[in-house]
């Protein structure tokens, strides 16, 4: 815990968010930016919130990378700041292990297509509270549990990044093969236009094992739609409750959790959970979800995807 937290116990009592920002030695840049973009008064009226507050150094680091927040278009800046306001009060003691996916005050139609609000992952790693935002960008909390009238604030050593579409997210996360197949099947625009979506993305090695070379464009599109659950944002915490859902092509999708905590979809292991998207969430899986067989037009032969577990 930072020395500031220990030396200023008065800041644990009730006061406005504006007062907290103006008196904290590392938050003057955020305070100025919120005033510049006419958000400070709005944020002062909110209740039951958690503010993830990038420090002065975090904004300096951004500027050194060529991203000066004070110079970006106002709608984008406001969306970015709203993304740093979480729904509910999340003190550090409530964030354990993998933690939780929490919705923010960034709501549609601006720069998110998640009805409940764009999400952030909170976790605890070796005693440090961590955030994971769009594109998998991580940040570490410095000062924790600074109270104000509307809730609690944690300072962060980085600015969070807005969730992006599945195309850029797949590129950043090394899922280029899935993106390549999306382009080949002509479903990129379709997938990017979805709202409140869950996408199960096989990693590149899994897709390399799957013999999709003989599939027509239509068959490949159907296969990829089998990895998409529309109108349901299924974060990892949902898997423990188990449940059945329908994919975009009508396949049955069953999620669950094994005794050792491993998440599964139709019995296939999830190797990376809760990749935050502009329109929902993605999970990286260890195999391709397929039907028992896929009929080819013309010769009526069948394509089998090697080493894959069939859907039931």
From Swiss-Prot:
Induction: Expression is up-regulated during the late stage of P.nodorum wheat leaf infection and is controlled by the cluster specific transporter elcR. Residues 1-16 form the signal peptide. Keywords: Glycoprotein, Repeat, Signal. Residues 17-160, 162-289 form the FAS1 domain. Transmembrane segments: none annotated. Pfam families: Fasciclin. GO terms for cellular component: extracellular space. Pathway: Secondary metabolite biosynthesis. Glycans are attached at residues 48, 68, 113, 157, 165. PANTHER family: FI19380P1 (PTHR10900:SF77), PERIOSTIN-RELATED (PTHR10900). Fasciclin-like arabinogalactan protein; part of the gene cluster that mediates the biosynthesis of elsinochrome C, a perelyenequinone phytotoxin structurally similar to cercosporin. The first step of elsinochrome C biosynthesis is performed by the polyketide synthase elcA which catalyzes the formation of nor-toralactone. This is Fasciclin-like arabinogalactan protein elcF. It comes from Phaeosphaeria nodorum (strain SN15 / ATCC MYA-4574 / FGSC 10173) (Glume blotch fungus). The gene is elcF.
């Amino acid at each position: 815990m930072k020395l500031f937290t220990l030396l200023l116990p008065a800041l644990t009592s009730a006061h406005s968010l504006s007062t907290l920002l103006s008196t904290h030695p590392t938050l003057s840049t955020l305070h100025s930016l919120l005033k510049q973009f006419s958000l400070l008064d709005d944020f002062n009226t909110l209740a039951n919130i958690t503010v993830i507050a990038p420090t002065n150094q975090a904004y300096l680091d951004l500027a050194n990378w060529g991203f000066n927040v004070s110079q970006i278009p106002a709608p984008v800046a406001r969306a970015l700041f709203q993304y740093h306001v979480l729904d509910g009060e999340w003190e550090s003691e409530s964030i354990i292990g993998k933690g939780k996916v929490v919705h923010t005050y960034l709501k549609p139609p601006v720069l998110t297509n998640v009805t409940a609000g764009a999400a952030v992952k909170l976790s605890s790693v070796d005693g440090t509270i961590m955030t994971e935002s769009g594109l998998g960008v991580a940040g570490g909390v410095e000062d924790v549990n600074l109270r104000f009238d509307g809730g609690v604030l944690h300072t962060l050593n980085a600015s969070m990044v807005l969730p992006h579409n599945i195309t850029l997210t797949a590129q950043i996360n090394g899922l280029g093969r899935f993106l390549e197949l999306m382009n080949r099947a002509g479903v990129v625009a379709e997938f990017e236009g979805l709202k409140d979506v869950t996408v199960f993305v096989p990693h590149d090695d899994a897709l390399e094992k799957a013999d999709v070379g003989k599939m027509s464009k239509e068959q490949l599109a159907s296969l990829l739609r089998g990895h998409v659950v529309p109108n349901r944002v299924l974060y990892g915490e949902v898997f423990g409750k188990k449940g059945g859902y329908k994919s975009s092509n009508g396949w049955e999708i069953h999620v669950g959790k094994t005794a050792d905590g491993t998440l599964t979809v139709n019995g296939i292991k999830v190797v990376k959970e809760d990749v935050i998207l502009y329109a929902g969430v993605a999970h990286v899986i260890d195999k391709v979800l397929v039907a028992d067989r896929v009929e080819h037009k013309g010769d009526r032969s069948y394509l089998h995807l090697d080493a894959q577990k069939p859907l039931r």
